[in-house]
Amino acid sequence: MNNHTLNIIILAAGKGTRMQFDHPKLLHLLGGKPILEHVINLAQSLCPKTITVIYNKQYKKFKIKNKNNSITWIKQKKILGTGNAISQIINNYKDHENILILYGDVPLISKNSIQKMLLKKKNSTITLLTAKLNNPEEYGRIIRKNKKIVKIIEYKDATDEQLNIKEVNSGILIVSSTNLKKWIFQIHAKNNQNEYYITDIISLANKDNHKINSVRPEKNDEIQGINNLLQLVRAEKIYQKQQAKLLLLSGIMIYNPSNFSLRGTLKHGKNIKIDHGVILEGSVKIGNSVIIEPGCIIKNSTIGNNCTIKAYSIIEKTIISNKCIVGPFTHLQHGTVLKNNTHVGNFVEIKKTTLGSYSKAKHLSYLGNSQIGQKVNIGAGTVTCNYNGKKKLDTIIGDNVFIGSSTQLIAPINIKKGTIIAAGTTVMKNIHEPSLVYNEKKQIHKKL
């Protein structure tokens, strides 16, 4: 089929009341992005003539945020069912074209399954995506007579006998625009929901002796709909299983795929090992020969080659260069850059700071708004005091500086390269030349 005659309608106007949540259903996240976005991405990958999203007022902000000249957004005036939604726009389409109907709450459909439908559509007026399920739950049932599809009955309108049918309707179908224009205005709302069902066109097509084909999805999991939080969790599990499988097949060792979560995109090299309970969010890049230990959370960050991220570290909007060691229990916040061969250890927090090559902060420190040179030692308990109550202030530390334990650096401050700062020192002024810096303190002994 020529996709230049393919028009896609995405139905996204349902109220989502079964979610029991004060958040639009299709804006809940699946794999780190809104449910609806998955369906839009699928539609765009098919390169159709047009894409139209029929939405309700809950999605106005999402529409504005995702404004795209290739997508038309139509607000459903009254929420009276899928048939009513399509009747609002059907006359916008030319005759003798094809219309693919997707659902905003069925986000796991693969491109391969849709392409199978497109091929089958050449020999029919309507092609449905159906599946046989051992536990059909609340799906509409496919009614056949002598193997021929004659009707779709929705779950709430089905008899007990019909509910025993295992073949179900995914909702996804391809139909000719010419016939849809005719049938869409013949359907009625005489059902338990008092809604106009798009599925009623099947019985109308059968009466007019039109051929109705069906196609099975690549996997039954693809047709998982999302109407409540339980189904969302189920869909997330399916999605993460798919992502873990793809990564394993591409050479990433994931030790516990059932406890790995990719909530965005990952670009990666070779020889990567990811342990139990790791979460990757947003856009993440990982180089070659990287080890990520249990419980790490990595968001919108880049990790270079030959790095080890030790257990329970949190890394966000950070660039880590090559041969670095991070963690365990390290928090790297936005604006952090670790140059080659750096080592950041236990209970160290870094924010808006560049740590130069071969520098190390191995224990219990806070470094904020800092530029730190090469081969600098940050002793345990070092704190950059970078906030004066009104604004953040900068700390600059030159190369080869040694900072002893339990040191406070009062920003703004500039410390010359080669300086040695003794343990327990509070540094309040710039150090303009290599120096030994300490605060005089008396050690007092009193007899008990």
Curated annotation (Swiss-Prot):
Query: Binding residues for Mg(2+), per the UniProt record?
Result: D105, N227
Provide the residue positions that the database annotates as binding acetyl-CoA: A380, N386, Y387, S405, A423
Name the domain of life this protein comes from.
Answer: Bacteria
How is the co-factor bound, per the entry? Binds 1 Mg(2+) ion per subunit.
**Major subcellular site:** cytoplasm
Annotated UDP-N-acetyl-alpha-D-glucosamine binding sites = 11-14, 25, 76, 81-82, 103-105, 140, 154, 169, 227, 351, 366, 377
Query: Listed GO cellular component terms?
Result: cytoplasm; membrane
Q: Which reaction does it catalyse?
A: alpha-D-glucosamine 1-phosphate + acetyl-CoA = N-acetyl-alpha-D-glucosamine 1-phosphate + CoA + H(+); N-acetyl-alpha-D-glucosamine 1-phosphate + UTP + H(+) = UDP-N-acetyl-alpha-D-glucosamine + diphosphate
What are the start and end residues of every segment in region (Linker)? Answer: 230-250
Q: Which UniProt keywords apply?
A: Acyltransferase, Cell shape, Cell wall biogenesis/degradation, Cytoplasm, Magnesium, Metal-binding, Multifunctional enzyme, Nucleotidyltransferase, Peptidoglycan synthesis, Repeat, Transferase
Q: Which residues of this protein are catalytic?
A: H363 (proton acceptor)
The record, for HAMAP family, names: GlmU (MF_01631)
Question: What is the name of this protein?
Answer: Bifunctional protein GlmU
- Tell me the organism: Buchnera aphidicola subsp. Baizongia pistaciae (strain Bp)
